[in-house]
From Swiss-Prot:
It comes from the Bacteria. This is Elongation factor G. It is found in: Cytoplasm. Keywords: Cytoplasm, Elongation factor, GTP-binding, Nucleotide-binding, Protein biosynthesis. Catalyzes the GTP-dependent ribosomal translocation step during translation elongation. During this step, the ribosome changes from the pre-translocational (PRE) to the post-translocational (POST) state as the newly formed A-site-bound peptidyl-tRNA and P-site-bound deacylated tRNA move to the P and E sites, respectively. Catalyzes the coordinated movement of the two tRNA molecules, the mRNA and conformational changes in the ribosome. GTP binds at residues 19-26, 90-94, 144-147. SUPFAM superfamilies: EF-G C-terminal domain-like (SSF54980), P-loop containing nucleoside triphosphate hydrolases (SSF52540), Ribosomal protein S5 domain 2-like (SSF54211), Translation proteins (SSF50447). GO terms for molecular function: GTP binding; GTPase activity; guanosine tetraphosphate binding; translation elongation factor activity. Residues 10-292 form the tr-type G domain. HAMAP family: EF_G_EF_2_B. One of its GO terms (cellular component) is cytoplasm. Pfam families: EFG_C, EFG_III, EFG_IV, GTP_EFTU, GTP_EFTU_D2.
Length: 699
């Protein structure tokens, strides 16, 4: 039996704070750390000193890039709870870093979505929300910046409903707004809460609800109680009988429905003005899940069967590495979430994906940028290990006697690449090491050498993503590099099916080469990927040569059909062929497969695909005409227009090739007042004139 835990599992919360880039997420996280007693001097983002944003660049750019994990403790606003541990995983809000968000959502149990009371639900919020839906993460909403001009709580609540298709249930209402924002109404306790400005909101007073708000409070309180009552027949009966529920019953009902992803409780405040954050922490404990409230994580056992691990110290150890970071003091830090069992520093763990055993050096618990060495971690904990060499993001580490591979993470394919070369000979060797380390940290960033030009090519999710990589090489590894023009990651595919023979025969003195195959090459749905099927009957091509044929096809697909870009979304079936007892070899069949694909694909109506980006531009009305005209010139397809307090919103799909340097152009079109976000949407067929120009350029 495991020894006793410091804090029981049901009093642990693993949460993320997710938000659009300017909703005030870092400030909210800061205040959480301040009130939980971790951080004594509040960091302010606009002074560039926030505790969570620990990489220099983030401090300069004022945006959060790396998801650091922080542990803090909370006893409740009125010290009403036993001690709870809250692990916060900081998630970035910038669209070039959705991979980081994905990675952190994978290991969270619940999340707080921060919305700006003025900007409301912005495009990035939608992206992150969709990702959270995919992982079934229960959420709370916090409408922040209630003190800002244009703040409107109920408008944001409606946007959560309309734009995110969620079911928001306010459990607070703001008292006043903009500079008159004074505090909040707690709908459960039916009290007004005013935080004390003299001690930065550490203390507060409860008061009666202002007269002029009573009618509205009654209306929203009824909606909240109905939402709670719908959690069970028992509560519904009590509500119908008494016309009310006790605060305990309301919390119980809301918790049940939040955990089932049926509702999103909404709170409000101003993190910057120190209002509302402690109540938000109480809500994290009241409504978000502990590790024991979420289903057991599934995975593949060593024998290939499906297995699972539930949150218990008594189960075998299993954890998922979700972040690798280089640390100037201790070297490589591997952040991981423990799903089951106990791990002590000095123990050995097994990495089933790499098939390697490794010893854990030190275990650290991170309090944003300070760290505490700990002796052990248990189910539900989030910590960092020092000394793991082969583990990369998304790998499982587990007990070698009970091997399991936990669900892997899916990482998107890069859409943009640039050639990069070291400025000096001295930078040459360092650059290889630096890029290798950065690629280990970030699976959406790739490095390869172009065989023809021998240039080093780096690929990523957007211009900002690659800029930051180059910047980090300079700062962390002291490598100066020249960066080429960004290149688009085009793809090729086919539009019709063909059957094609590939026959490779070489007779020279002695043993010859003989491989003969017939392939059926067919288009697949966009995004469906590559499929290879063996339909050989009667052994006309022996089974041992089939993998070689597939390898030949795959290699040829990398070389493209007309323009040299990788081929995607095709199905290749080998259905006929012949072999020679003496002369056939894997090599011969690989070449035959490659020949058949090359010839067949070129007859299958090949087309060039280009990445299309989903772009959202927010512009003051007076620049609308210029902005739309410019987007049309960039081959943009306008999808819709909307209003927001920040200006007109234009939703548009634009080929990535037309978007280079857009930030600068948009600034000059709108005198710096318009903003945009962009994320990868899909690959689509390039118009023939564009495709021809690209093919010509490639040849």
């Amino acid at each position: 039996m495991a020894t006793a835990r410091e804090i029981p599992l049901d009093r642990t919360r693993n949460i993320g704070i997710m938000a659009h880039i300017d909703a005030g997420k870092t400030t909210t996280t800061e205040r959480v750390l301040y009130y939980t007693g971790v951080s004594h001097k509040m960091g302010e983002v606009h002074e560039g000193s926030a505790v969570m944003d620990w990489m220099e660049q983030e401090q300069e750019r004022g945006i959060t890039i790396t998801s650091a994990a922080t542990t803090c403790y909370w006893l409740g606003m009125d010290q009403q709870y036993p001690k709870h541990r809250i692990n916060i995983i900081d998630t970035p809000g910038h669209v070039d870093f959705t991979i980081e968000v994905e990675r952190s959502l994978r290991v969270l149990d619940g999340a707080v979505a921060v919305f700006c009371s003025v900007g409301g639900v912005e495009p990035q919020s939608e992206t992150v929300w969709r990702q959270a839906n995919r992982y079934h993460v229960p959420r709370l909403g916090f409408v922040n910046k209630m003190d800002r001009a244009g703040a409107n709580f109920l408008r944001v609540v409606n946007q959560v409903k309309d734009r995110l298709n969620a079911n928001p249930i306010p459990i607070q209402l703001p008292i006043g707004a903009e500079e008159d924002f004074k505090g909040v109404i707690d709908l459960i306790r039916e009290k007004a809460i005013y935080w004390n400005e003299a001690d930065r909101g550490r203390t507060y007073e409860l008061a009666d609800i202002p007269e002029d708000m009573k009618v509205e409070v009654q209306k929203w309180r009824e909606k909240m109680i109905e939402a709670a009552a719908e959690s069970s027949e028992e509560l519904m009966d009590k509500y119908l009988e008494a016309g009310d529920l006790s605060p305990e019953q309301i919390r119980q009902g809301l918790r049940q429905r939040t955990l089932a992803n049926e509702i999103v409780p909404i709170l409000c405040g101003s993190a910057f003005k120190n209002k509302g954050v402690q109540a938000l922490l109480d809500a994290v404990i009241d409504y978000l899940p502990s590790p024991t409230d979420v289903p057991a994580i599934r995975g593949e056992e060593d024998d290939g069967s499906e297995g699972s691990r539930s949150a218990s110290d008594d189960e075998p150890f299993a954890a998922l590495a979700f972040k690798i970071a280089s640390d100037p003091f201790v070297g490589t830090l591997t952040f991981f979430r423990v799903y089951s069992g106990i791990l002590k520093s000095g123990d050995s763990v097994y990495n089933p994906i790499k098939g390697k055993k490794e010893r854990i050096g030190r275990l650290l618990q991170m309090h944003s940028n300070s760290r505490e060495e700990i002796k052990e971690v248990r189910a539900g904990d989030i910590a960092a290990a020092v000394g793991l060499k082969t583990v990369t993001t998304g790998d499982t580490i587990c007990n070698q006697q009970n091997i399991i591979t936990l669900e892997k993470m899916d990482f998107p394919e890069p859409v943009i690449s640039v050639a990069i070369e070291p400025k000096t000979k001295a930078d040459q060797e360092k650059m290889g090491v630096a890029l290798g380390k950065l690629a280990q940290e970030d699976p959406s960033f790739r490095v390869h050498t172009d065989e023809e030009s021998a240039q080093t090519i780096i690929e990523g999710m957007g211009e900002l993503h690659l800029e930051i990589i180059v910047d980090r090489m300079r700062r962390e590894f002291n490598v100066e590099a020249n960066v080429g023009k960004p290149r688009v990651a085009y793809r090729e595919t086919i539009r019709r099916s063909v059957e094609q023979q590939g026959k490779y025969i070489r007779q020279t003195g002695g043993r010859g080469q003989y491989g003969d195959v017939w392939l059926r090459i067919e288009p697949r749905e966009p995004g469906a990927g590559f499929e290879f099927e063996n339909a050989i009957v009667g052994g006309v091509v022996p089974r041992e040569y089939i993998p070689a044929v597939e390898k030949g096809v795959r290699e040829q697909m990398e070389n493209g059909i007309r323009a040299g870009y990788p081929v995607v979304d095709v199905k290749v079936t080998i259905f006929e062929g012949s072999y020679h007892d003496v002369d056939s070899s894997e090599m011969a069949f690989k070449i035959a497969g490659s020949m058949a694909f090359k010839e067949g694909a070129s007859k299958a109506d090949p087309v060039l695909l280009e990445p299309i980006m989903k772009v959202e531009v927010v512009t003051p009305e007076e620049y609308m005409g210029d902005v739309v005209g410019d987007l049309n010139r960039r081959r943009g397809m306008i999808q819709g227009m909307d209003e927001s307090p920040a200006g007109k919103i234009v939703d548009v799909e634009v080929p990535l090739a037309e978007m280079f340097g857009y930030a600068t152009d948009l600034r000059s079109l709108s005198q710096g007042r318009a903003t945009y976000t962009m994320e990868f949407l899909k690959y689509a067929e390039a118009p023939s004139n564009i495709a021809e120009a690209i093919i010509k350029q490639q040849s």
